[in-house]
Regions:
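Rossmann-like flavin
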Residues: 104-189
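A conserved FAD-binding loop/helix module that cradles the flavin
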Residues: 479-501
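N-terminal glycine-rich phosphate/pyrophosphate-binding loop and immediately adjacent elements
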Residues: 2-131
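C-terminal segments that line or cap access tunnels to active or ligand-binding sites in enzymes
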Residues: 329-437
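Active-site-adjacent "gating/activation" loops or surface patches in catalytic cores
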Residues: 178-205, 469-472
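Mid-domain catalytic core of redox enzymes
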Residues: 236-281, 287, 298-379
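A glycine-rich dinucleotide-binding beta-alpha-beta segment and adjacent secondary-structure elements
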Residues: 165, 169-179, 365, 424-483
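Helical element adjacent to the flavin cofactor pocket in flavoenzyme catalytic cores
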Residues: 195-245
């Protein structure tokens, strides 16, 4: 098929950032189309159906929750710029969350959507550090100071200026890394500030039906604004002449042109699509991008713009497995009703890195989607617990199918055993009778359904805050631009659309 269409803006990927960018651009009359390889929108924050049940992937809770009328926050900006009434998301606040360390769970910090709760707990359990904690919070840059240029300074060094107790340092980093770090055992200072505000100074909330509510709202806003969307229709190549993308070749053979291209699929993934149309050559030469940058022939180098040496985004190393257990009763009936999210680690030191084995069950995140303060009659009918642990993509990707399925079951049991050490005890037979369904996804699943290389949920550790690529009309939005999670992705799409298209 050789049909050809032109758009003001083509967006690669129908994830949260792509949808947000599309809505923003369509509001201002731009002819925009989103091209998505998969059959479901949402990207890393989507859902799937299995045996008649819908399971969220990605979203545990919406971060950055603030109440009505609070100004200068990411949530407020998103609602305003996407023209969403906050009631459309039906956000219910968390009950309360914990950070638990030690083999017996002996070190505990509580936090809620009231920052005073965590501060009071630190004052009680780490009295010598309370002044440092308050000074640390006061030193966090505001949102208006973030994002102009990446501050890749070690967040551990930054926190070390204020907090001396190594246990408290590890406990502070545990939830922030699990919910937003692409770097092993550290964070960029900017990312630390964003996540600390999102979790500790703002908070968690969730719609009754999870990510499906958010997606329904976004898709309807995009449709009403006049945006086009093509599902199961990915981009296979970005053909470039000189320093500009000239054509997008779709997987079905169609050719699309656009004045601007916004890509939400990741930095490395986007660059892997680029094909240089070089005058004088018989055929375009693909540019192969690796962790050390481009592998280019002398011929192609003579014809392409010299690339910024700093623009060598490596593939991310951090991926996860997640188990899901569905109950025929609410978690509180089992004695698990007070926790919304539990971040656990079974020693005093938190090791946030790609594990040597398939899974690292020593630490993880336990989420109870039922344990939010839903309006009457709006809580999920069935109970659920989700447990997330670090995983090694390479140890999963090449397994024969029979071994793969067996390993999933083996690790499901091991992850449950590890997580339950940090929850009130429930007899095995009671839990077995209450369980009506289970599932598990792995790094291999993540790559299959999102196309993210190495199952890297948080993308490359090298972020590009201005979204610029070696091509002057191709820009990044989403995880590799630097904002993560649902709120971060939405904000990224809005910001990149504003910066690169609407302000020109």
């Amino acid at each position: 098929m050789n049909s050809r269409s032109h758009y003001d803006v083509a967006i690669i990927g129908a994830g949260m950032s792509g949808l947000a960018a599309g809505i923003r651009l369509a509001h201002f009359g731009k002819r925009v189309c989103i091209f998505e390889r998969h059959n479901a929108p949402g990207g890393l924050n989507s859902f799937y159906s299995l045996a008649g049940r819908k399971y969220d992937v990605g979203l545990h809770a919406l971060t950055n929750f603030v109440g009505p009328g609070v100004k200068g926050t990411p949530l407020g900006k998103i609602l305003r710029q996407l023209r969403i009434d906050r009631g459309e998301f039906e956000l219910a606040e968390q009950r309360g969350s914990r950070i638990v360390f030690g083999a017996q769970g002996e070190h505990v910090l509580h936090f809620t959507n009231d920052p005073a709760v965590l501060t009071a707990d630190i004052a009680q359990k780490f009295p010598g550090e309370i002044d440092g904690w308050r000074a640390l919070l006061a030193a966090l840059p505001g949102y208006d100071a973030l994002g102009a240029a990446v501050d890749a300074t070690s967040a551990r060094e930054f926190v070390g200026r204020f907090i001396r107790d190594p246990l408290l340092v590890e406990m502070i980093f545990c939830p922030l890394m699990f919910y937003g770090s692409a770097r092993e055992n550290d964070m960029d200072c900017d990312q630390f500030a964003i996540m600390a505000r999102a979790l500790f100074l703002e908070g968690f909330a969730r719609p009754p039906d999870g990510v499906r509510v958010i997606l329904r709202v976004l898709l309807e806003k995009y449709r009403v604004a006049g945006g086009e969307r093509r599902m199961k229709c990915g981009v296979s190549r970005i053909v470039a002449t000189g320093d500009r993308a000239t054509t997008l070749v779709l997987e079905n053979g169609e050719e699309i042109t656009a004045d601007h291209v916004l890509s939400s699929i990741g930095a490395v993934e986007t660059l892997n699509l680029v094909e240089r149309a070089v005058p004088g050559l018989r055929s375009p030469e693909p540019v192969e991008w690796g962790e050390e940058g481009p592998a280019r022939s002398e011929t192609s180098m003579e014809n392409e713009r010299v690339r910024d040496d700093a623009f060598h985004p490596p593939t991310g190393k951090l991926s996860f497995v997640e188990t899901m257990t569905v109950f025929d009763r609410q978690p509180e009936v089992l004695g698990w009703g007070s926790d919304t999210i539990v971040f656990f680690n079974d020693s005093a030191r938190f090791d946030y890195a790609r594990p040597a084995e398939q899974v690292d069950p020593r630490s993880g995140v336990i989420c109870f989607p039922n344990n939010f303060e839903y309006a009457a009659g709006r809580a999920p009918a069935e109970g659920m617990v989700r447990v997330t642990c670090l995983a090694n993509y390479d140890r999963w990707v090449q397994l024969p199918e029979e071994t793969y399925q067996a390993d999933k079951q083996r690790w499901f049991a091991e992850i449950q055993r590890s997580a339950r050490r940090f929850l009130p005890p429930v007899p095995e037979d009671t839990l077995a009778r209450a369980t009506v369904a289970t599932d598990i996804f792995t790094p291999r699943t993540i790559t299959k359904f999102t196309s993210h290389l190495a199952g890297a949920v948080y993308g490359s550790p090298q972020k590009i805050p201005d979204g610029r690529t070696p091509l002057r009309n191709v820009y990044l939005c989403g995880t590799d631009q630097g904002f993560v999670g649902v709120i971060g992705a939405l904000l990224s799409g809005i910001s990149m659309a504003n910066l690169h298209v609407l302000r020109k």
